[in-house]
Amino acid sequence: MDADSGNTLAGARGAATRLPAQDLERARRFYSEKLGLEPVDERPGGLLYRCGQSEFALFLSTGASPGTFTQMGWTVDDVDAVVAELGRRGVVFEEVDLPGFRTRDGIAEIEGNYPSKGARGERGAWFRDSEGNMLGIGQPVV
């Protein structure tokens, strides 16, 4: 426990991301063909991926339902370029039109998101993987 903040996780070395998959082979194809990612480790019922300094795992789950909010996301330098490239690979981005939150060509401009990181906002885009998990891409606007 960090005595200064009272936060028991302040000293953690990272967070684990685990996404459910009802069909691991279908998920493997999606992450390979659409996102260009290959597993770095494979165990019965699970695949481990590495992206830069981060890792995430897909696990075989027959009961978990996909999320309606972002379950995992990546920070990128150029959200437009990433959206364009993934679109060419067949990724379909969510279109949202809600009061105060709207995407245009799959990308939302979010004012005031993540000010603690020195950003005045974020440009973000969301899509679902082959298992229905909501994934996001974000570019801080400084």
Stretches with model-predicted labels:
Residues 1-25, 55, 69-72, 138-142:
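N-terminal beta-strand motif that seeds the catalytic metal site of vicinal oxygen chelate
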Residues 5-6, 26, 33-37, 111-115:
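Intrinsically disordered, low-complexity segments enriched in polar/charged residues with Gly/Pro
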Residues 11, 66, 118-119:
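Short, flexible hinge/linker loops that cap or flank conserved catalytic cores
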Residues 11-12, 18-56, 61-63, 81, ...:
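Core segments of cupin and vicinal oxygen chelate
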Residues 15, 44-45, 70, 123:
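Residue-level marker for the onset of beta-strands and adjacent loop->beta junctions
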Residues 23-25, 72-134, 139-142:
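Vicinal oxygen chelate
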Residues 61-65, 141-142:
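A short, sequence-level motif marking secondary-structure junctions
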